[in-house]
């Protein structure tokens, strides 16, 4: 699984920009909190994807390592 970090970073920047707009023009606490929530969801999603990719890389390394060991023996 390839993670497209720039895409997530763009989404994160977009959410931040929206949040600042809402705070500047519509000081509605509800909207601000909603944006903060969406921001945290994005961060959690990104972290989950990073963990999954790391797990897959580890599994791949382990499986290729075992294949290499059995060939050597």
Task: For the regions a language model picked out, list residue spans one by one.
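Charge-dense, intrinsically disordered terminal/linker segments
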Residues: 1-73
């Amino acid at each position: 699984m390839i993670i497209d970090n720039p895409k997530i970073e763009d989404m994160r920047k977009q959410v931040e920009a929206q949040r600042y707009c809402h705070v500047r023009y519509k000081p509605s606490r509800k909207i601000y909190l909603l944006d903060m929530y969406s921001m945290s969801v994005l961060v959690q999603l990104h972290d989950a994807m990073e963990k999954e990719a790391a797990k897959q890389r580890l599994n791949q390394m382990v499986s290729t390592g075992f294949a290499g060991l059995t060939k050597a023996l």
